[in-house]
């Protein structure tokens, strides 16, 4: 198995001893985080809104939890419901991180960031990358968007929000419960209870959806419950432009599987569960691929996540395939969320 680059520290999620420097820095990080949040709560630091509903998708832990598949699915659902959503993102990993820009499906990943380019490619929505989420939201409103989806902006308190959706890994949850860098927490785990919706990413698991906390459909302004999300794969898309084929057509075959995501083993496990023989190649999250990265020494199909695929389009050939990932949540979740957003739209129009 190829392993390149840094990985999530093991002590975040197991009983490995925490290094002394990390233990010493965690209280400092926690104190700074608490002071900053308190300043916003007391109004000493001001929040600024925009004249349309704002939905923030984020997490209180560092690392991937499935926010991007959920963002793509949410944007698609909003479009189907008649909204014109715009997506605000920081665009992590791009070369000119300090520059605000519009992102579409053809934007080079080095300029737009892999996740924003993927979102634009999959949805066709307006996407704006900017370290200042408020400025991004304002630009999207000026461009005609009537709802803002903020990708990974839970801690960006300067932008006022109407709905918060927290996404958490169903297996790892909040790890050892410690603040960065001693643990995975960006904020105390209790912060998650303040969010309107909690989505638990089960990965490739049962499609049964059970609300655990709160009421899944309610008329109140908060406490819409905890929902389980399942990620599914059922097809592969040749990157040379040919038609997609069922993933089942590769059952019993060996493939090279490439993943430059926070938890690459999840992708490999999903392929194995479909009866595919996986030769795994894990790369760092947000890795910038070169053609040489795919010199594996054996000519087998190369399967990769769509997040990786958007970075490989310049040198794609007939051996490279992307695997679309779908986020599946219960119908009641969408009823609850869309009903809330309809009410918010009325409030904003009356303001």
From Swiss-Prot:
GO terms for molecular function: ATP binding; tetraacyldisaccharide 4'-kinase activity. The keyword Kinase applies. Transmembrane segments: none annotated. Keywords: ATP-binding, Kinase, Lipid A biosynthesis, Lipid biosynthesis, Lipid metabolism, Nucleotide-binding, Transferase. Pathway: Glycolipid biosynthesis; lipid IV(A) biosynthesis; lipid IV(A) from (3R)-3-hydroxytetradecanoyl-[acyl-carrier-protein] and UDP-N-acetyl-alpha-D-glucosamine: step 6/6. Its EC number is 2.7.1.130. Coiled coil: none annotated. It comes from the Bacteria. ATP binds at residues 61-68. InterPro entries: LpxK, P-loop_NTPase. Signal peptide: none annotated. One of its GO terms (biological process) is lipid A biosynthetic process. One of its GO terms (cellular component) is plasma membrane. It catalyses: a lipid A disaccharide + ATP = a lipid IVA + ADP + H(+). The keyword Lipid biosynthesis applies. PANTHER family: TETRAACYLDISACCHARIDE 4'-KINASE (PTHR42724), TETRAACYLDISACCHARIDE 4'-KINASE, MITOCHONDRIAL-RELATED (PTHR42724:SF1). HAMAP family: LpxK (MF_00409). Transfers the gamma-phosphate of ATP to the 4'-position of a tetraacyldisaccharide 1-phosphate intermediate (termed DS-1-P) to form tetraacyldisaccharide 1,4'-bis-phosphate (lipid IVA). Belongs to the LpxK family. This is Tetraacyldisaccharide 4'-kinase. It comes from Xanthomonas campestris pv. campestris (strain ATCC 33913 / DSM 3586 / NCPPB 528 / LMG 568 / P 25). The gene is lpxK.
């Amino acid at each position: 198995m190829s392993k390149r680059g840094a990985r999530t520290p093991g002590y975040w999620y197991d009983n490995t001893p925490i290094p002394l420097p990390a233990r010493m820095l965690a209280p400092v990080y926690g104190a700074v985080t608490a002071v900053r949040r308190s300043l916003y709560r007391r109004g000493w630091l001001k929040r600024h809104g925009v004249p349309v509903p704002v939905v923030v998708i984020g997490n209180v832990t560092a690392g991937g939890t499935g926010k991007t598949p959920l963002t793509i699915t949410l944007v698609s659902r909003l479009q189907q419901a008649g909204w014109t959503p715009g997506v605000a993102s920081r665009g992590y990993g791009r070369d000119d991180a300090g520059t605000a820009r519009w992102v579409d499906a053809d934007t080079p990943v080095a300029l737009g960031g892999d996740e924003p380019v993927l979102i634009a490619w999959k949805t066709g929505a307006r996407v704006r990358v900017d370290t200042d989420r408020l400025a991004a939201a304002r630009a999207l409103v000026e461009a005609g968007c009537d709802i803002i989806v903020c990708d990974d902006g839970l801690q960006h308190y300067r932008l006022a929000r109407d709905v918060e959706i927290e996404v958490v890994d169903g297996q790892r949850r909040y790890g050892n419960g410690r603040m960065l860098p001693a643990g995975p927490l960006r904020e105390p785990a209790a912060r998650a209870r303040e969010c309107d919706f909690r989505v638990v990413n089960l990965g490739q698991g049962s499609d049964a959806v059970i609300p655990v906390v709160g009421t899944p459909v309610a008329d109140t302004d908060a406490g819409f419950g905890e929902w389980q999300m399942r990620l599914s794969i059922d097809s592969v898309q040749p990157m040379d432009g040919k038609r997609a084929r069922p993933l089942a057509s590769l059952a019993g075959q060996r493939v090279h599987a490439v993943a430059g995501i926070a938890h690459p083993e999840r992708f490999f496990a999903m392929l194995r569960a479909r009866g595919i023989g996986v030769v795994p190649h894990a790369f760092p999250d947000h890795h910038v691929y070169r053609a040489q990265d795919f010199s594996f020494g054996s000519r087998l199909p190369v399967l990769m996540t769509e997040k990786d695929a958007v970075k490989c389009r310049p040198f794609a050939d007939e051996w490279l395939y992307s695997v679309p990932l779908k986020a599946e949540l219960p119908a009641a979740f969408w009823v609850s969320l869309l009903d809330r957003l309809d009410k918010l739209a009325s409030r904003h129009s009356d303001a």
